[in-house]
Design a protein with these regions (language model features):
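Glycine-centered tight turns that cap/initiate beta-strands
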Residues: 120, 285, 308-311
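Protease zymogen maturation seam
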Residues: 2, 89-99, 103-165, 177-180, ...
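Substrate-binding/access-modulating region of protease and related hydrolase catalytic domains
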Residues: 230-306, 363-378, 445
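Extracellular S/T/G-rich loop segment that most often corresponds to the catalytic His/Ser-adjacent loop
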Residues: 170-172, 301-389
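Short helix-loop-beta-strand segments that form the rim/entrance of peptidase-like active sites
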Residues: 215-236, 240, 393-409
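Active-site core segment of subtilase-fold serine proteases
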Residues: 141-223, 243-251, 349-353, 357-365, ...
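Inhibitory N-terminal propeptides of secreted protease zymogens
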Residues: 14-126, 132
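C-terminal subdomain of the subtilisin-like protease fold in secreted/lumenal serine endopeptidases
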Residues: 249, 253-261, 267, 271, ...
């Protein structure tokens, strides 16, 4: 499997009967959430027992050019009638979803091994499960409570984003999100309701609101819409995601933020996205920004690793080093602050589900401190939106300009970096990569 040669992150655990790790617990939550919807999730592990990838059982993705041959190969016997071929669902031009129910090889990994040997690697792949959780994704930690009057950090920039539309595909928007001034006017599909200190905060409720808050702080007058797509313990199958993204393109966004992703079988690109780019290229100017994952590895994390995507890693709290949890490598385009950010969150009681705080209960009052490349990505998405409104560039042009700036101010041993508006130790406002002030980052009296 693809994980044989990866550099593993510090939180990954095995399936050898030892105390559950963060990843083990998140896998169980995702498997249970999909099972409630009648969908079985397969768990592929590396030879050492660590997680390799998650996938939807009983279906595979197949390139259309090979579909007739693969479908015939999967018949239970050579004498099966044509009507007994596995059922097919067209997904996007170039790729189809093929059911393995009743086929010769009903289990995904077994079927793919046989297809690889017969037709070649990459003809068919699993429909991988992508996630906003620490299962090869983000955030890197569970949220920490902060006082109710805590201000967002990074705080709002000076204007920016006027006339720009940011689309956030995530877990949804909290009903009371616009109680926070920087989120006023943000729209979207609602997260499960909370609102009183005693009410439980479910799963990754609040993740989408936090992401939207970070983006809005960088582009305070942008139009932001949050779609509740990752509603199964913060996870979604790749073939469902590309359908949602296709619908999003029809709304005409300038920037799409995707704070989710995953690793794949044999580290191959997500097959559904390979064909999605054919649709994407017809929508001039829109840019997709995605988080690079929190596994502290250089293993490709998809879809951030695609060249068509702005893949965002996280800087540490001091903003001068890579965050310990952030993925890295040549496929990461830029690093931005993602450690200890503060923004809008749910109100209610949160029970920790991951080590080292399993079972502890904390009460949140509409704000939280959270870490992960999940939150570095919307910071960059917001900077792109702010630049669009300032320069008249479209999304892809603005992203290209900012990435050039990021390379020019790279940190040795880290890579290209972007910073938000901030203040120096002297209290002066320093320059921001969104362009709200001129000069290089760090221009102040310090």
């Amino acid at each position: 499997m693809g994980g044989d040669s990866t550099e593993r992150g510090p939180d990954e655990g095995g399936a050898d009967g030892h105390e559950p790790t963060v990843v083990d617990i998140q896998v169980d939550l995702i498997v249970a959430a999909f099972r409630e919807k009648g969908i079985e999730v397969g768990v592929a592990r590396c030879p050492d027992g660590t997680l390799d990838f998650l996938f939807e059982e009983s279906v595979i993705l197949v390139r259309d050019a090979y579909l007739p041959g693969v479908a015939a190969f999967l018949r239970r016997s050579d004498t099966d009638a044509a009507e007994q071929l596995p059922p097919v669902t067209g997904l996007l031009p170039g790729v189809s979803l093929l059911s393995l129910a009743g086929s010769r090889f009903p289990r995904v990994l077994e079927a793919l091994d046989e297809i690889d040997a017969r037709f070649g690697v990459g003809v068919a792949t699993p429909s991988h499960i992508l996630s906003v959780t620490p299962v090869h994704a983000c955030p890197a930690t569970e949220p920490d409570e902060v006082p109710r009057d805590t201000l967002p950090d990074p705080g709002p920039c000076e204007g920016g984003g006027g006339g720009v539309f940011i689309y956030v595909t995530d877990t949804g928007l909290l009903k009371d999100a616009d109680d926070h001034p920087w989120l006023a006017g943000v729209t979207g599909q609602l997260d499960p309701p909370t609102g009183i200190p005693e009410s439980p905060i479910h799963g990754y409720t609040g993740h989408g609101t936090f992401v939207a808050g970070v983006a809005r702080c960088m582009a305070p007058v942008s139009q932001v819409r949050v779609s509740r797509d990752f509603d199964k313990a913060g996870a979604l199958s790749e073939h469902e995601l590309v359908k949602r993204l296709g619908q999003a393109l029809g709304l005409g966004p300038d920037v799409i933020n995707l704070s989710a992703g995953g690793t794949t079988r044999k580290n191959l690109p997500l097959l559904s996205f390979v064909t999605f780019w054919e649709t994407y290229r017809h929508y001039k100017g829109v840019v997709l920004v995605a988080s690079a994952g929190n596994n502290s590895t250089r293993r490709p994390f998809w879809p951030a690793a695609f060249p068509q995507v702005v893949g965002v890693g996280a800087l540490a709290a001091d903003r001068r080093a890579r965050a310990y949890f952030s993925d890295f490598g040549p496929w990461v385009d830029v690093y931005a602050p993602g450690d200890g950010l503060v923004n809008a969150y749910a109100t209610g009681a949160y029970t920790y589900r991951e080590p080292p705080r399993i079972g502890q209960v904390r009460h949140f009052h509409g704000m939280a401190r959270w870490s992960g490349t999940s939150f570095a990505a919307p910071l960059v998405a917001g900077l792109i939106a702010a630049r669009i409104s300032r320069t008249g560039e479209n999304g892809r042009q603005a992203a290209s300009s900012l990435l050039a700036q990021a390379r020019a101010q790279h940190l040795p041993g880290v890579g290209p970096v972007l910073w938000p508006c901030d203040t120096g130790d002297c209290g002066d406002r320093v320059a921001c990569c969104c362009g709200s002030r001129h000069g290089a980052v760090g221009d102040c009296r310090c």
